[in-house]
Amino acid sequence: MADEQLDEKNLNSEEAGAVNGDARVQELEEQLAAAKDQSLRAAADLQNIRRRAEQDVEKAHKFALEKFAGDLLPIIDSLERGLELSNADDDTIKPMREGIELTLKMFHDTLKRYNLEALEPHGEPFNAEHHQAMAMQESADVEPNSVLKVFQKGYLLNGRLLRPAMVVVSKSPAPAQPSIDEKA
Protein backbone atom coordinates (compact mmCIF):
# COMPACT_ATOMS: atom_id res chain seq x y z
CA MET A 1 0.00 0.00 0.00
CA ALA A 2 2.79 2.32 0.79
CA ASP A 3 4.31 1.38 -2.56
CA GLU A 4 1.07 2.27 -4.31
CA GLN A 5 0.96 5.64 -2.61
CA LEU A 6 4.56 6.32 -3.59
CA ASP A 7 3.83 5.30 -7.19
CA GLU A 8 0.78 7.53 -7.18
CA LYS A 9 2.79 10.46 -5.77
CA ASN A 10 5.52 9.91 -8.37
CA LEU A 11 2.88 9.74 -11.09
CA ASN A 12 1.23 12.93 -9.84
CA SER A 13 4.57 14.71 -9.57
CA GLU A 14 5.52 13.54 -13.10
CA GLU A 15 2.19 14.82 -14.44
CA ALA A 16 2.69 18.08 -12.56
CA GLY A 17 6.24 18.27 -13.93
CA ALA A 18 4.92 17.62 -17.45
CA VAL A 19 2.30 20.33 -17.04
CA ASN A 20 4.93 22.69 -15.61
CA GLY A 21 7.30 21.69 -18.43
CA ASP A 22 4.65 22.39 -21.08
CA ALA A 23 3.95 25.77 -19.51
CA ARG A 24 7.68 26.51 -19.41
CA VAL A 25 8.09 25.51 -23.08
CA GLN A 26 5.17 27.74 -24.04
CA GLU A 27 6.65 30.62 -22.02
CA LEU A 28 10.04 30.17 -23.69
CA GLU A 29 8.43 30.02 -27.15
CA GLU A 30 6.63 33.29 -26.42
CA GLN A 31 9.90 34.87 -25.28
CA LEU A 32 11.61 33.60 -28.44
CA ALA A 33 8.83 35.03 -30.63
CA ALA A 34 9.09 38.37 -28.80
CA ALA A 35 12.88 38.38 -29.22
CA LYS A 36 12.54 37.60 -32.96
CA ASP A 37 9.98 40.39 -33.33
CA GLN A 38 12.26 42.82 -31.49
CA SER A 39 15.19 41.76 -33.67
CA LEU A 40 13.16 42.33 -36.87
CA ARG A 41 12.05 45.75 -35.64
CA ALA A 42 15.63 46.71 -34.80
CA ALA A 43 16.78 45.58 -38.25
CA ALA A 44 13.97 47.59 -39.90
CA ASP A 45 14.85 50.66 -37.81
CA LEU A 46 18.50 50.32 -38.80
CA GLN A 47 17.55 50.03 -42.47
CA ASN A 48 15.34 53.15 -42.18
CA ILE A 49 18.16 55.09 -40.51
CA ARG A 50 20.59 54.07 -43.28
CA ARG A 51 18.09 55.06 -45.98
CA ARG A 52 17.45 58.45 -44.34
CA ALA A 53 21.19 59.06 -43.96
CA GLU A 54 21.75 58.23 -47.64
CA GLN A 55 18.94 60.61 -48.63
CA ASP A 56 20.40 63.36 -46.43
CA VAL A 57 23.84 62.91 -47.98
CA GLU A 58 22.32 62.93 -51.47
CA LYS A 59 20.42 66.15 -50.71
CA ALA A 60 23.55 67.70 -49.21
CA HIS A 61 25.47 66.93 -52.41
CA LYS A 62 22.64 68.17 -54.62
CA PHE A 63 22.13 71.44 -52.82
CA ALA A 64 25.63 72.18 -51.50
CA LEU A 65 25.99 74.75 -54.27
CA GLU A 66 22.77 76.53 -53.35
CA LYS A 67 24.33 79.50 -51.53
CA PHE A 68 27.23 79.80 -53.96
CA ALA A 69 24.92 79.67 -56.99
CA GLY A 70 22.60 82.20 -55.37
CA ASP A 71 25.55 84.56 -54.91
CA LEU A 72 26.46 84.24 -58.62
CA LEU A 73 22.99 85.15 -59.91
CA PRO A 74 23.36 88.94 -59.46
CA ILE A 75 26.58 88.80 -61.51
CA ILE A 76 24.77 87.01 -64.33
CA ASP A 77 21.92 89.54 -64.09
CA SER A 78 24.42 92.41 -64.40
CA LEU A 79 26.12 90.87 -67.44
CA GLU A 80 22.74 90.33 -69.13
CA ARG A 81 21.63 93.90 -68.33
CA GLY A 82 24.92 95.22 -69.70
CA LEU A 83 24.28 93.42 -72.99
CA GLU A 84 20.68 94.67 -73.15
CA LEU A 85 21.67 98.28 -72.55
CA SER A 86 24.66 98.35 -74.90
CA ASN A 87 24.20 99.17 -78.56
CA ALA A 88 25.05 96.15 -80.72
CA ASP A 89 25.68 98.42 -83.73
CA ASP A 90 28.31 100.56 -81.98
CA ASP A 91 31.70 99.40 -83.32
CA THR A 92 33.61 101.05 -80.48
CA ILE A 93 32.11 98.70 -77.88
CA LYS A 94 31.83 95.65 -80.11
CA PRO A 95 34.90 93.88 -78.61
CA MET A 96 33.60 94.55 -75.10
CA ARG A 97 30.15 93.17 -76.04
CA GLU A 98 31.77 90.04 -77.48
CA GLY A 99 33.75 89.58 -74.27
CA ILE A 100 30.61 89.95 -72.16
CA GLU A 101 28.73 87.51 -74.43
CA LEU A 102 31.53 84.92 -74.12
CA THR A 103 31.71 85.37 -70.35
CA LEU A 104 27.95 85.02 -70.08
CA LYS A 105 27.98 81.90 -72.27
CA MET A 106 30.64 80.36 -70.03
CA PHE A 107 28.52 81.18 -66.98
CA HIS A 108 25.43 79.60 -68.54
CA ASP A 109 27.35 76.47 -69.58
CA THR A 110 28.76 76.09 -66.06
CA LEU A 111 25.34 76.57 -64.48
CA LYS A 112 23.83 73.96 -66.80
CA ARG A 113 26.58 71.49 -65.87
CA TYR A 114 25.55 71.82 -62.21
CA ASN A 115 21.79 71.50 -62.95
CA LEU A 116 21.00 75.17 -62.44
CA GLU A 117 18.36 76.18 -64.95
CA ALA A 118 16.91 79.59 -65.72
CA LEU A 119 13.18 80.27 -65.60
CA GLU A 120 12.17 82.54 -68.46
CA PRO A 121 8.38 82.53 -68.15
CA HIS A 122 7.49 85.24 -70.71
CA GLY A 123 4.08 84.36 -72.17
CA GLU A 124 3.52 81.41 -69.81
CA PRO A 125 0.67 81.20 -67.29
CA PHE A 126 1.58 82.67 -63.89
CA ASN A 127 2.81 80.00 -61.46
CA ALA A 128 2.98 81.17 -57.83
CA GLU A 129 5.50 78.44 -57.04
CA HIS A 130 8.07 79.77 -59.53
CA HIS A 131 7.06 83.39 -60.14
CA GLN A 132 6.80 86.47 -57.97
CA ALA A 133 4.26 88.98 -59.30
CA MET A 134 5.68 92.49 -59.08
CA ALA A 135 2.77 94.17 -60.87
CA MET A 136 -0.49 93.52 -62.69
CA GLN A 137 -1.17 95.08 -66.07
CA GLU A 138 -4.32 95.11 -68.16
CA SER A 139 -3.94 93.40 -71.51
CA ALA A 140 -6.43 92.35 -74.14
CA ASP A 141 -3.71 90.62 -76.20
CA VAL A 142 -3.01 87.70 -73.85
CA GLU A 143 -4.93 85.47 -71.47
CA PRO A 144 -5.44 86.83 -67.95
CA ASN A 145 -2.81 85.63 -65.44
CA SER A 146 -0.13 85.27 -68.10
CA VAL A 147 3.38 86.63 -67.69
CA LEU A 148 3.73 89.82 -69.75
CA LYS A 149 7.22 90.89 -68.76
CA VAL A 150 10.12 89.41 -66.80
CA PHE A 151 12.00 91.87 -64.57
CA GLN A 152 14.42 89.24 -63.29
CA LYS A 153 14.86 85.60 -64.30
CA GLY A 154 14.20 82.89 -61.79
CA TYR A 155 16.39 79.83 -61.29
CA LEU A 156 15.96 76.19 -60.26
CA LEU A 157 18.76 74.13 -58.73
CA ASN A 158 18.18 70.40 -59.28
CA GLY A 159 14.48 71.10 -59.72
CA ARG A 160 14.20 73.11 -56.48
CA LEU A 161 13.47 76.83 -56.62
CA LEU A 162 16.57 78.91 -55.95
CA ARG A 163 15.10 82.28 -56.88
CA PRO A 164 11.61 83.09 -58.21
CA ALA A 165 11.24 85.00 -61.46
CA MET A 166 10.03 88.57 -60.87
CA VAL A 167 7.27 89.21 -63.37
CA VAL A 168 4.43 91.46 -64.53
CA VAL A 169 1.18 89.51 -64.80
CA SER A 170 -1.68 90.28 -67.18
CA LYS A 171 -5.22 90.91 -66.07
CA SER A 172 -8.44 91.37 -68.00
CA PRO A 173 -9.05 94.90 -69.18
CA ALA A 174 -11.58 96.78 -67.11
CA PRO A 175 -14.91 97.24 -68.83
CA ALA A 176 -15.10 100.63 -70.48
CA GLN A 177 -16.85 103.21 -68.34
CA PRO A 178 -19.69 104.89 -70.17
CA SER A 179 -18.86 108.48 -70.98
CA ILE A 180 -21.03 111.34 -69.80
CA ASP A 181 -22.51 111.69 -73.28
CA GLU A 182 -23.54 108.02 -73.32
CA LYS A 183 -25.23 108.32 -69.93
CA ALA A 184 -27.45 111.17 -71.09
From Swiss-Prot:
Gene Ontology molecular-function annotations = adenyl-nucleotide exchange factor activity; protein homodimerization activity; protein-folding chaperone binding; unfolded protein binding
Where is it localised? Cytoplasm
Q: Name one GO biological process term.
A: protein folding
* Record InterPro entries: GrpE (IPR000740), GrpE_coiled_coil (IPR013805), GrpE_head (IPR009012)
Q: Does the keyword Cytoplasm apply?
A: yes
GO cellular component annotations of the record: cytosol
Residue ranges for the region (Disordered) are 1-24
Q: Which UniProt keywords apply?
A: Chaperone, Cytoplasm, Stress response
Keyword check for Cytoplasm, yes or no. Answer: yes
Q: Which domain of life is it from?
A: Bacteria
Purpose of the protein: Participates actively in the response to hyperosmotic and heat shock by preventing the aggregation of stress-denatured proteins, in association with DnaK and GrpE. It is the nucleotide exchange factor for DnaK and may function as a thermosensor. Unfolded proteins bind initially to DnaJ; upon interaction with the DnaJ-bound protein, DnaK hydrolyzes its bound ATP, resulting in the formation of a stable complex. GrpE releases ADP from DnaK; ATP binding to DnaK triggers the release of the substrate protein, thus completing the reaction cycle.
- Complex formation: Homodimer.
Membership in a protein family: Belongs to the GrpE family.
Query: Which HAMAP family does this one have?
Result: GrpE (MF_01151)
Protein's name in the database: Protein GrpE
User: From which source organism is this entry?
Assistant: Pseudomonas entomophila (strain L48)
